[in-house]
């Protein structure tokens, strides 16, 4: 039997709420979303205005499956108390991290800027850029060397002088989390026949593997029979904010 146009128009996929930003499409499966995408942005979306996000192209992606709860991954991301013992290579690129500090605002008396070390061009295995520096960046953004945007609960973006790395997080089970890391570069870099992003990819993979190891150790510790609760160090105020954000979600 032939169907009418009206009947076929009603046979589409179920509608979902979606927002396009920065070259990504974000989906919210809630029937009536209570939170808009930008409301969870930390800091505001404008922090990445000088990066040409919409035109960047994917050079490489890597999928990890971590044996930990998704909240443990975020707790690890939101502090650098673990950095000196876990990320020695990263601490050489960002001296502030040697002080167990994620940002200079945690301890202004440290007198160490939240920026890459002198002579460092980018987050790569040899500290040198693997692509042309984005011409739209300010001198301060180039000097800092890394600008972060956090989009709880599913993504953070690390913007560097020559590339952008975005990390997406998805819970699979109560103790398993999928993490997808993507390295994005300008079309000009991608069109260059000599372009080789491997040093940026290798460095990002190193950091994520180090984080995965401590996250999985933490998960196993939560299963220890004597465990009741943990304690936050003074440097972990962002973790406290995360706990309060999550508790707020659970109370609504």
Descriptions of predicted regions:
Residues 1-27:
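Short Fe-S-cluster ligation motifs
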Residues 17-252:
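C-terminal catalytic domain of Rieske-type non-heme iron oxygenases
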């Amino acid at each position: 039997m032939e169907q009418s146009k009206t009947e076929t128009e009603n046979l589409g996929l179920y509608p979902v709420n979606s927002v396009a930003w920065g070259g990504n499409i974000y989906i919210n499966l809630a029937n009536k979303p209570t939170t808009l995408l930008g409301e969870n942005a930390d800091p505001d979306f404008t922090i990445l205005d000088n990066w040409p996000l919409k035109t960047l192209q994917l050079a490489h992606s890597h999928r990890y499956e971590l044996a930990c709860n998704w909240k443990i991954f975020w707790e690890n991301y939101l502090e650098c108390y673990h950095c000196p013992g876990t990320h020695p290579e990263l601490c050489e690129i960002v001296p502030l991290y040697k002080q167990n500090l994620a940002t200079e605002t945690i301890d202004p008396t440290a007198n160490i800027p939240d920026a890459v070390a002198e002579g460092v061009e980018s987050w790569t295995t040899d500290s040198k850029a693997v692509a042309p520096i984005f011409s739209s960046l300010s001198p301060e953004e180039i000097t800092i060397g890394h600008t972060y945007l956090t989009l709880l609960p599913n993504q953070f973006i690390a913007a560097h002088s020559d590339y952008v790395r975005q990390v997406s997080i998805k819970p699979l089970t109560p103790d398993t989390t999928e993490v997808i890391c993507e390295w994005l570069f300008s079309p000009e870099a991608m069109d260059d026949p000599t372009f080789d992003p491997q040093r940026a990819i290798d460095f990002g993979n190193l950091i994520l593997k180090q984080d995965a190891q401590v996250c999985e150790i933490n998960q196993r510790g939560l299963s220890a029979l004597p465990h009741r609760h943990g304690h936050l160090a003074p440097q972990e105020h962002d973790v406290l904010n995360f706990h309060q954000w999550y508790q707020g979600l659970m109370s609504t």
